Amino acid sequence: NDQLARAYRLAASICEDIGNSMLSEEINLLNQGIEQLPDGYYNALAGQLASAYIRQAEATGNPGYQKDALRTYQQLEKNGNTTLEVRLNIAMLQYQLHDFSKAMEMLQALKDDYPKDYRVYKWLAFVQGELDLQNGASYTKTLGYYETAAELYRAEQASGVYDPQMDELDRMARNNWQ
């Protein structure tokens, strides 16, 4: 079974390397692997599957793939994979699917668990910005999250990290949240 799981992952990776033209095949391979292998192998294939769903959503503009990715990440979390990356991806997808209250709930928990990770505050700023816009509220909380994200991000930049979403957040802070 280990070899079969590796074979599915490798075949899916080859599809990913070829590019967007093979996304459907990559998704089908990973789903087939999940169906064929015992439940214990779900987590070994699911992260790759969720990533493929996200790329397919970007390539097609179809939010159904984001929902598939969200369900996949939520199952990963339910299966005990509670890493920062899995939980951040859940919050990011909830944000993209306009479920701002659920995204905020996840991000508040992440803030407690990872108080020094700029990505948590980046997404808190995005989500709070949407909530403030909907509620006609001042952007005080949003700017607070943004400032914390920017400060923590500067430390990451010193070690060579670049995050284009932080550029987007900078633009939003300058243009929308004053």
Residue ranges with predicted function:
Residues 19-21, 57, 64, 98, ...:
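Residue-level detector of the short coil/turn that links helix A to helix B
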Residues 1-2, 38-40, 81, 115, ...:
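Short coil turns that delineate tetratricopeptide repeat
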Residues 5, 41-43, 50, 83-85, ...:
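Helix-start (N-cap) detector for alpha-helical repeat units in TPR-like alpha-solenoids
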Residues 31, 129, 138-158:
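TPR/TPR-like (Sel1-like) alpha-helical repeat modules
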Residues 3, 10, 48, 89, ...:
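Canonical tetratricopeptide repeat
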Residues 13, 51, 55-58, 92, ...:
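Residue-level recognition of tetratricopeptide repeat
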